């Protein structure tokens, strides 16, 4: 494990386990530069670099999740989203949105509050989704939008845990720990 004095880049997310995840994986292989680095996910706490000790972070996440029961999520429809960070393809959450927003809010308190990005500090600024593409070239982006808007698959899962990953220098995701909902069981 990394030393306690080192800066560690982490992210906190949900890794849904859909029966039809191959549909998402195929889209991401085409359009998401991070497809080979991290599994399909919903970000709860965006990447941050800190010296927070593993045990300290575990305790914070366990406390943040204390009153959260496992819950169902449903995702469907891929939409385009342009912002200052790029041209994105988002798989939209249609069920489980309130629970995800509450977890996000609970996590960005205490020791993680200082790592909350400025762009997330406004009212209603967090819109949970699953990124399935980031396309720089405008022509390729327009093609990707047309290709993915035809996809009408529905993705459902019961969220039972939250994952904390370490992002290494190659942008690879290394699961540091997983905390179960309600019972805080460690996976």
Where do the model's predicted regions map?
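Histidine-dependent nucleotide/RNA phosphoesterase domain, centered on the 2H-phosphoesterase fold
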Residues: 2-187
């Amino acid at each position: 494990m990394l030393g306690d004095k080192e800066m560690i880049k982490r992210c906190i997310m949900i890794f849904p386990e859909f029966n039809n995840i191959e549909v998402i994986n195929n889209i991401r292989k085409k359009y998401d530069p991070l497809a080979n680095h991290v599994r399909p996910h919903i970000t709860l706490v965006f990447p941050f670099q800190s010296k927070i000790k593993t045990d300290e972070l575990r305790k914070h996440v366990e406390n943040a999740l204390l009153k959260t029961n496992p819950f169902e999520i449903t995702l469907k429809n891929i939409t385009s989203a342009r912002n200052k960070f790029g041209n994105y393809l988002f798989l939209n959450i249609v069920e489980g949105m309130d629970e995800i927003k509450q977890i996000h809010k609970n996590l960005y308190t205490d020791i993680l509050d200082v790592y909350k990005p400025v762009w997330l500090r406004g009212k209603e600024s967090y819109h949970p989704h699953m990124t399935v593409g980031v396309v720089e070239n405008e022509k390729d982006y327009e093609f990707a939008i047309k290709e993915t808007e035809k996809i009408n698959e529905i993705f459902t899962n019961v969220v039972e845990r939250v994952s904390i990953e370490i992002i290494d220098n190659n942008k690879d995701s290394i699961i540091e720990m997983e905390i179960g909902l309600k019972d805080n069981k460690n996976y």
